[in-house]
């Protein structure tokens, strides 16, 4: 009887260990995904309307730019490069992060002649109607910026409410975001339910843009 009881206790112990292992595996997998593959953010501001609305929750891929190259049109999450959040605190995603659309790659010259005129990249005008907020000018003022090596130029889709690269040309980074500060590229909106959908990079908008002189 004693031997049988010991066997039974051993079986109970093995069953408990087995349960703990199988419960722990999914938790570990989720943690690894969160750490290495995906980021999750709540969007508090309207700087990316109507692509992303305040209150939307988005998923980002951490594989770009670590594994895959950034492309013009990507919706990127990045660390605040030089106190941008002091001017655009409502865009804070938690921590010191912002979300914008990538417009210029290293070597690109991004420019606009002001209200009513399109953004040009390396002298080629782009049609941003696929993502820019309706009724908003591509830029309310003129500018011309050449993107330096290791940096990108970003703008919000709601140009009238986005303190983006255009507004920070006087800071230490000249309004450019170091690629090393980009932590992910937007994949999809997952909440609220009526807003579920992919985050389109609209790479086709930039199809005719030539490579920059210093790329």
Q: Can you name each region flagged by the protein language model?
A:
Residues 1-16, 20-21, 32, 36-42, ...:
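Soluble "head" domains of membrane/secretory-pathway proteins
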């Amino acid at each position: 009887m004693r031997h049988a009881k010991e066997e039974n206790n051993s079986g109970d112990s093995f069953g408990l260990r087995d349960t703990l292992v199988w419960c722990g595996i999914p938790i570990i997998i989720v943690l690894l995904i969160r750490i290495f593959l995906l980021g999750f953010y709540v969007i508090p501001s309207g700087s990316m309307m109507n692509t992303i609305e305040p209150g939307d929750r988005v998923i980002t891929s951490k594989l770009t730019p670590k594994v895959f190259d950034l492309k013009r049109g990507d919706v990127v999450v990045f660390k605040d490069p030089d106190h941008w959040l002091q001017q655009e605190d409502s865009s804070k995603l938690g921590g010191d992060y912002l979300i914008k659309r990538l417009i210029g790659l290293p070597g690109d010259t991004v420019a606009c002649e002001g209200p009513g005129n399109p953004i040009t990249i390396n002298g080629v005008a782009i049609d941003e109607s696929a993502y820019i907020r309706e009724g908003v000018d591509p830029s309310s003022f003129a500018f011309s910026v050449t993107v330096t090596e290791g940096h990108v130029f970003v703008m919000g889709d709601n140009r009238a409410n986005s303190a983006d690269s255009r507004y920070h040309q006087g800071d230490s980074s000249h309004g450019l975001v170091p690629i090393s500060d980009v932590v992910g590229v937007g994949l999809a909106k997952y909440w609220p339910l009526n807003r579920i959908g992919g985050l389109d990079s609209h790479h086709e908008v930039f199809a005719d843009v030539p490579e920059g002189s210093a790329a």
